[in-house]
């Protein structure tokens, strides 16, 4: 029984497929059958998308033309034909000048045509509302300002490390952090540097009035190095310039002369007392020298750097003084040493006047107690 269409319909249906499956069923369909179908579907989708875009474009209602637009519609075509090399912006400038040059009588027909188009537009679209394609400039500026503020704010996940590197926790990077020089860091990074340097000073115990005198002797010897001159200027009390320079020069002379004095007489109690006295006095910038040693430093108070002859003479005088102090009675030397700081500073201590050196209170303890008491009253002056 033959088909009613004579087999044309079956041939049309099998055009997308090859005839090999009919003759050789084991080979299956041809490889180019599915790509052809997929290409056809893609074309259909593109056609549908273009139809939708056209529908949207047609759905958009255009505004009615004004008189200038009605006149420029034909005039722009004429100018474009006469000047094919000119840009559209140049054509618009020429059209604007030509429109302004027209008289009211010449503009009247275009104005009437624009009014007719406006009335027709109102009749065709009674509920028309103008919707501009471009947003207003004010909204754009506001959005730019808010975006700028968000960019200016630091991210919450940004953490500044102690070594001055910025780590972003939100980004999962497969490589390690790279170190950058401090010059490339942002401005805000240097505010964290004091916190990074603070742990270096945790090991030092700063002397306070509540600490005992023995803590000064047991402290780290590295802390009692030669102090900078800024500490002497930042002390709460102040003397005249000559007295301060006298103390600083005396401190430098004592530091240079102490090793020589130790080499000449080892094991002397006088040298031991002077060695114990030098450490806290050098730190606080106050020199408690005996009257004889202070007398030799007075002529050098006004000089910034004494000549080498004066240093040699002072060194020889100091060696002679050490020899003389070794021959002085021990109790007499302790008596002058314990009260020399009070007499020089001009302060009266009622609580320390009655202290008498005994077997327990040796020269070291008396020197340390006098030094700690003087430092306490100098750092905390009475109102």
Swiss-Prot record:
A Gene Ontology biological process term: Wnt signaling pathway
Entries under InterPro entries matching the protein: HMG_box_dom, HMG_box_dom_sf, Sox7/17/18_central, Sox_C, SRY-related_HMG-box_TF-like
Motif interval(s): 9aaTAD: 331-339
DNA bind region: 61-129
Record keywords, A-Z: Activator, Developmental protein, DNA-binding, Gastrulation, Nucleus, Transcription, Transcription regulation, Wnt signaling pathway
Identification of the protein by name: Transcription factor Sox-17-alpha
Gene expressing this chain: sox17a
Highest taxon of the lineage: Eukaryota
Main location: nucleus
Functional note: Transcription activator. Binds to the DNA sequence 5'-AACAAT-3'. All of the sox17 proteins are required for embryonic endoderm development and gastrulation movements, and show some redundancy in function. In addition, the sox17 proteins have distinct but overlapping roles in later gut development. Acts downstream of vegt-signaling in endoderm differentiation to induce a range of endodermal genes both directly (including endodermin and dhh/chh) and indirectly. Also represses wnt-responsive genes to inhibit wnt/beta-catenin signaling.
CDD domains named in the record: HMG-box_SoxF_SOX17
Subcellular location, record wording: Nucleus
Spans annotated as Required for transcriptional activity and interaction with ctnnb1: 332-337
Tissue: Expressed throughout the deep and superficial endoderm during gastrulation. During neural and early tail bud stages, expression declines significantly in the anterior endoderm, except in the endoderm behind the cement gland. Strong expression persists in the endoderm posterior to the liver diverticulum until late tail bud stage. By late tailbud, expression is undetectable in most of the endoderm but is maintained in the presumptive gall bladder region and the extreme posterior region. In addition, expressed in endothelial cells in the head and along the flank of the embryo.
Subunit structure: Interacts (via C-terminus) with ctnnb1/beta-catenin (via Armadillo repeats); this interaction is required for inhibition of wnt-signaling.
GO annotations of cellular component type: nucleus
The record's note on its domains: The 9aaTAD motif is a transactivation domain present in a large number of yeast and animal transcription factors.
